[in-house]
Curated annotation (Swiss-Prot):
It comes from Desulfitobacterium hafniense (strain Y51). This is Glutamate mutase epsilon subunit. Its EC number is 5.4.99.1. Adenosylcob(III)alamin binds at residues 68, 123, 180, 297, 326, 330, 334. It holds the Pfam family Met_asp_mut_E. The lineage of its organism: Bacteria, Bacillati, Bacillota, Clostridia, Eubacteriales. The gene is glmE.
């Protein structure tokens, strides 16, 4: 396997860079040294890493939406509205689907059509096509830091252009932006692509420019057991730090049970620090991001606000550094700027009300933390064993062996053998373990919790239970109970 978790050699980076910057005409505008100078002239208040570190030190949970449209002026207006009317602490630039698949000619067609019809014909901002100077306008106008959010297996050119354009945060990873998003991209290939991205971030760090990196925590966003998403997050964190990344934000997608969600967001940075230290890394700063519910939403706006508020409460009580906000129009498609801003304000109201409160440690919360730690360590230890100490090699082999298995992912490189289901209290458990490397004690815990739900509902745990859980929140509940 032509893959290793060592820092990319300068010669290899330079060889790839020449190829990457020639993938689209705007790549020729990238000048690394000039970009470093541009970053150093930006005010500290626009740097993502610094603001996250300040929030972590002060115990603040920040709110950030998702948003992106095709044309520059319209996207600028959208960001202005979300900052001023939504009171967003951080702003996004969500990238369109064509750019995510490196289909820049089709993205250009979308730009042209958007200009023609007077509205966005793309589901995001095509940053590669707009180029470095346009990206700098996006950074210069808002008062708060702006992040690139996308879903791209090969995000090398996008990273070159947006980082040269002044963005100070970049989402994604070789696993989290492949397995949930693509069908035919090998994990080995996407990890290599993202080693390039992380090395680029590391090069900025070496020049004194801090760029935040954020692996995508929720994965498929559908009943993903915390230990599975934690395993991927920690691996991607290790791969990033190996290339010189220092500011790392690890993510988790809300499952819905408050104790499990709080336990998950509390254990994630501790597990990451544990394994980074175990592998000899010392120069890193870990913050956390909590994603409000990523599954199906109620169509009723009032009910959608309820789901948003529950996610905000879990983020606040879990002491996440940042929460990614949903809109009350989630079930209907791309939200209006007004709906998006309303979701942020709803979230911030909850965050402000709960900022001085904490969830006391109870026997059940302690148990959830213990189970997440033990399960995640089982996955990570087996992954390291498979890679003979190399986490990049181990990650590829772990997916091949089913040691890491993401529920409901489209990728043919994912086993798809595990089945999750909720227990009686809505916590996500594992109904079918596939090849997850859990001890018999861990498996028995999951079996007992799901069996208890089966007894409560008068039915045998089965795939129908899983289906019921997938649709439950859209129908106004957390646990998919059978109709009485």
């Amino acid at each position: 396997m032509d893959l290793t978790n060592r820092m990319m050699e300068p010669e290899e980076f330079a060889r790839q860079r020449q190829e990457v910057l020639n993938q689209w005409a705007t790549g020729r505008d990238v000048d690394f040294e000039e970009a470093v100078a541009y970053h150093k002239n930006l005010p500290r208040s626009k740097n993502f890493s610094y603001k996250l570190a300040e929030g972590k030190a002060r115990g603040i949970t920040f709110a950030q939406p998702r948003a992106g449209v095709a044309l520059l002026n319209e996207h600028l207006e959208l960001l202005r509205f979300l900052e001023e009317e939504g009171e967003a602490d951080f702003l996004p630039t969500t990238i369109d689907s064509y750019t995510r698949q490196n289909r820049y000619a089709e993205a250009q067609t979308g730009i042209d059509e958007s200009r023609l019809v007077g509205r966005s014909m793309l589901n995001g901002f095509p940053a590669v096509n707009h180029g470095v100077s346009a990206c700098r306008r996006l950074i210069e106008h808002p008062k708060v830091p702006v992040q690139v959010r996308h879903g791209t297996p090969d995000a090398r050119l996008l990273a070159e252009i947006t980082l040269a354009g002044g963005f100070t945060a970049y989402e994604g990873g070789g696993i989290s932006y492949n397995i949930p998003y693509a069908k035919d991209v090998s994990i080995e290939k996407s990890i290599k692509y993202w080693q390039y991205v992380d090395r680029l971030v590391g090069m900025y760090e070496e020049k004194g420019v801090s760029i935040n990196r954020e692996p995508f925590g929720p994965l498929t966003g559908t009943l993903v057991p915390p230990s599975v998403s934690h395993g991927v997050a920690v691996i991607e964190g290790i791969l990033a730090v190996a290339q010189g990344v220092r500011s790392l934000t690890l993510g988790y997608g809300q499952c819905g049970n408050l104790l499990q969600d709080v336990a998950a967001i509390r254990t994630l940075p501790l597990l990451a620090a544990e394994y980074l230290s175990k592998l000899g890394y010392t120069d890193f700063d870990i913050t956390t991001v909590f994603h409000q519910w990523m599954g199906g939403f109620p169509q009723d706006e009032a009910k959608a606000y309820g789901v948003i508020s529950w996610g905000a409460a879990a983020a606040a009580l879990g002491k996440a550094t940042k929460v990614i906000v949903k809109s009350p129009h989630e079930a209907l498609g791309i939200p209006t700027k007004e709906a998006n801003a309303a979701g942020i304000r709803t979230t911030k109201q909850i965050l402000n009300m709960l900022k001085d409160q904490s969830l006391p440690m109870t026997e059940e919360l302690a148990l959830e933390e213990k189970m997440i730690r033990e399960e995640t360590r089982a996955i990570l230890d087996r992954t390291l064993d498979l890679g003979e100490g190399d986490m990049a090699v181990g990650a590829v082999r772990a997916f091949q062996a089913g040691v890491i298995d993401v529920p409901f992912a489209p990728s043919r490189y994912n086993g798809g053998r595990i089945l999750p289901a909720r227990d009686s209290q809505g916590a996500v458990r594992v109904l079918d373990f596939g090849n997850l490397p859990f001890s018999e004690e861990i498996k028995e815990f999951h079996r007992e919790r799901i069996a208890r739900r089966g007894r409560d509902e008068g039915r045998e745990p089965s795939f129908q239970m899983v289906i019921d859980d997938i649709y439950a929140i859209g129908k106004g509940m957390l646990v998919g109970r059978p109709r009485s």
